Amino acid sequence: MTTQWPRLNLAAGPVEVMPRTLRDQGRPILYHYDPAFIELFARTSGLLQQVFRTEYDAVIMQGEAILGLEAAAASLISPGDKVLNLVSGVFGKWFEDFIEKYGGETIELAVPYDDAVDPEDVRRALHANPGVKFLSVVHSETPSGTHNPVRDICRVAHEFGVLTMIDTVSGLGGELYSPEEWGMDVAVAGPQKCLGGTPGLTLMSVSPAAWAAMEARRPGPLRGSFLSILDWKSAWLEGRRFPYTPSVSEVYSLESVLEQTLAIGMERFVDRHQLIAAAARAGVRALGLDLWPARDEIAAACVTAVTVPDGLDEALLRKTMRHRYGVMISPGYGSLQGKLFRLAHMGPAQAHPTTLAAQLAVLERSLVDVGHPVALGAGVGAAMAALGNWNDEA
């Protein structure tokens, strides 16, 4: 028997995409050295710079964003380099595997997975560990629904001459970035989260200092590898060539979502995510449920993480939402499995009042179905009341 597809994909990514994106992705395949594709790739790179709000080089690597995270480590870290790795969640901890794989020495600064890293603790760690060359941090920890104060963290790092590697996979589109002002040397994002695109590409912003560090890597620059960011610099940025065949249809999709994002306007696009996230938190609280993040100021814009209350079978809850009502949400991930579940609201299709209302309505009904009574309509009502000045056409 074939499993029926969900009516609503409200999981933590890949997310639902807009009809225009699917249409644009389905355009005829071009030869990657056709002048039309070269023009399209250049235009898409320029759009990506606008979304990052940077004059730094934009790099579009051909692989899901985990490729870009490993590429950052592989291209920058020399054996013996000290890397201050900030850990506030599953993905922050995971990055240590890359640091050590490429010979780096990890210095870990960790906080509980419902909290965020304090920039002053970063300052103290850098004082206590002279010679740190790089700092790595996750901006938006999707598994725990939290975010770190990346702007202040990066500024502290630059005070010490430390280059920064930022995981913005689920952050881009949920917050306004300014890599030059903030001190983001390598920022790695994905199109399948807040931008509402399809998975398959890595989106990067790379500073001049990061390029120089890649060239200075010991025993030599990483070249001739799928992980080489420098290969993209010399091939595409300097020569309008590709180090390997790009994923043509994925580039079509990326161009489409970047155009749609900029048509809305970056400030408005981010404001929508922030507003929907606040409404989701209000809805969850109205159902008598606790949020996983320790405080609202560190709650992510992309997902709302909900603590599993005592006595609730969260796997049964998710199964009920998915198979009885057709709504897919995400469980906890890694060490957080069974401790929380996540309501996603990222990208234009998810971060919308209509979608949020449906998600909360199904959550309410499913909680009742699995024996955890709540007042039907309470969550939806609180969320809609919290939306304030939402206007699709404004």
Predicted regions and their residues:
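A glycine-/small-polar-enriched, mobile loop at the entrance of the PLP active site in fold-type I
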Residues: 6-62, 66
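Active-site C-terminal subdomain of aminotransferase-like
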Residues: 16-17, 192-286, 390-394
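Active-site phosphate-binding strand-loop segment of PLP-dependent enzymes
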Residues: 117-171, 186
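Conserved active-site segment immediately N-terminal to the catalytic lysine
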Residues: 180-192
